[in-house]
Amino acid sequence: MILDMIQEWFKELLIDGIISNLTEMFDTLNTKVGEIAGEVGMTPAAWNSSIFNMIRNLSETVIVPIAGIILTFVMCYELIQLIIEKNNLHDFDTWIFFKWIFKTFCAVLIVTNTWNIVMAVFDVAQNVVSQSAGVIISDAGIDISGVVGNLETQLADWSVGALLGLWFQSVFVGLCTQILSICIFLVIYGRMIEVYLVTSIGPIPFATMINREWGSTGQNYLRSLLALGFQAFLIMICVGIYAVLVEGISTSGDNISAAIWGCMGYTVLLCYTLFKTGSLAKSLFGAH
C-alpha cells in the first residue's frame, strides 16, 4: 500500500513536471516567433528611436563632411576625365563643363539627401512586409492543448519508467529551445544593428556614385540597402513556413514524444533558415 502511494505520488510529480516543461517550452517559442513577426516589419526609426536619432546625428555631423571631401576629389577627377577623354584636348568642347556642373549638382543632391534616400528604401521594405504579413502568416503560435490534448489524462495511464523518460526528454528539449530562442534573438537584433551600421556611413559611398570608375561602390551600397530591407520579407516567409509546419504538430495524433521532437526540429529549421536569409538576400540583389 505504501509503495503504491509513493508510486502514485511520484507519477503525479513527473506528470506535473512534464506539463510544466512543455508549457514553458511552447510559451517560449510562441513569444520568440511573435517577436520575429512583430519586429522585422519595423523601420529603423520605429524599432528604437534613441539609436535612430544617435545614428542620424552621427551621419549628418561626422560622415557628411567626410563625404563632402570625398565628393570634391571625385568630381575633380571626373572633370579631368571629361577634359582629357576628347583626344587629349584636341576635340575640346565647352559643353562638357555644363555636363560636369549637372553631374556635380546631382552628386551634391544625393549626398545631402542620403538619409532620406536610405529611409525611403526601408519604408518601401516595411510596406512590403506589412502587406505580406496578413497573407503569409495569420498565427504562428503553437497551441499546447492542440499538441498534447488532455495530457494529464493520457499520462495517468503511463508507467513510471515511461513518464521518467518523457520528463528527461522534455527537460532536454526545453533547454535546447532556450538556446534556439537566443539564436532567434541574435538574428533579429543582429540584423537591426547591421541596418544602423550601414545607414550611418551612407553619405560616403553615395559620394562616389556619379563617377564611372568609382560608382560601383555606391551602387553596391544601394544593393546592400535593398538586401537588408527585403531580408525582412524573407524572414516573414520563413516564419510563415514555420507556422504551416507546426500546424501539422497540433493535429498529429497522440504521440507526445513525436510532438516534442517535431517541434524542436522545426525550430532548428527555422533558426537555420533565418541565418541564411542575409546571404540569400545579398545574392538576390547582387550585393557583396
Each predicted region: which residue ranges?
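Alpha-helical transmembrane segments of multi-pass membrane proteins
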Residues: 224-236
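Alpha-helical transmembrane segments
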Residues: 206-223, 251, 283-284
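Hydrophobic transmembrane alpha-helix segments characteristic of membrane transport
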Residues: 70-108, 201-215
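Non-cytosolic segments of integral membrane proteins
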Residues: 14, 18, 22, 29, ...
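Juxtamembrane "helix exit" motif at the C-terminal ends of alpha-helical transmembrane segments
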Residues: 68, 72-84, 235-250
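Alpha-helical transmembrane segments and their helix-start/interface "positive-inside/aromatic belt" motifs
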Residues: 2, 7-18, 92-114, 218-227
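Alpha-helical membrane-interface segments at transmembrane helix boundaries
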Residues: 55-64, 95, 99-102, 156, ...
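Binding/recognition "hotspot" determinant
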Residues: 1-70
